[in-house]
Every structure is written in structure tokens, then in C-alpha cells.
Amino acid sequence: MANIKSAKKRAVQSEKRRQHNASRRSMMRTFVKKVYAAIAAGDKEAAQNAFSAMQPIVDRQASKGLIHKNKAARHKSNLTAQINAMQ
């Protein structure tokens, strides 16, 4: 454990940020999973609606640095291709 006052403060701030980021990351993953679930169910309209809800969330997390922008692009590209391939 830190002994210096500033190090203690940084440890508290770091833990607070970790919890905040974990919450945001979990929320983002839930939105992505909803799209995958709709694709697996074969419901194209539900998949498109879930994708529309997921896209700004993923973009926002990428812009804030929670995930890399290429990861956000990869999620969107893969899911778009899967939705378009549906009947």
C-alpha cells in the first residue's frame, strides 16, 4: 500500500477509474451480444435495430479511449457483414 499522500490519492483515483471503465466496457459488450443473439436467432430486423443501438455506444467508447478505434471498426464491420448476409 502507498505511504505517500499523493500516491494514496492516485490509488483511489485509479480504482475509481477502473470501476467506471469496467461498467462502461460491460455495457458495451452487452449491446454487442444483443446483436449477435439477434443474428443467431435469424431475426434480421431485430439484428438491425440492435446494431443501430450498439453503433453509437461502441463509437463513443472508442472516442473516449476505452477501446481502440480499430476494434470498434472491426466490431461494426463484422456485424454489418453478418446482418447483410442474412436472408
From Swiss-Prot:
<dbReference type="GO" id="GO:0006412">
    <property type="term" value="P:translation"/>
</dbReference>
<keyword id="KW-0699">rRNA-binding</keyword>
<comment type="similarity">
    <text>Belongs to the bacterial ribosomal protein bS20 family.</text>
</comment>
<keyword id="KW-0689">Ribosomal protein</keyword>
<dbReference type="GO" id="GO:0003735">
    <property type="term" value="F:structural constituent of ribosome"/>
</dbReference>
<keyword id="KW-0694">RNA-binding</keyword>
<dbReference type="GO" id="GO:0005829">
    <property type="term" value="C:cytosol"/>
</dbReference>
<protein>
    <recommendedName>
        <fullName>Small ribosomal subunit protein bS20</fullName>
    </recommendedName>
</protein>
<comment type="function">
    <text>Binds directly to 16S ribosomal RNA.</text>
</comment>
<feature type="region of interest" description="Disordered">
    <location>
        <begin position="1"/>
        <end position="27"/>
    </location>
</feature>
<dbReference type="Pfam" id="PF01649">
    <property type="entry name" value="Ribosomal_S20p"/>
</dbReference>
<dbReference type="GO" id="GO:0070181">
    <property type="term" value="F:small ribosomal subunit rRNA binding"/>
</dbReference>
<dbReference type="InterPro" id="IPR002583">
    <property type="entry name" value="Ribosomal_bS20"/>
</dbReference>
<dbReference type="GO" id="GO:0015935">
    <property type="term" value="C:small ribosomal subunit"/>
</dbReference>
<dbReference type="InterPro" id="IPR036510">
    <property type="entry name" value="Ribosomal_bS20_sf"/>
</dbReference>
<keyword id="KW-0687">Ribonucleoprotein</keyword>
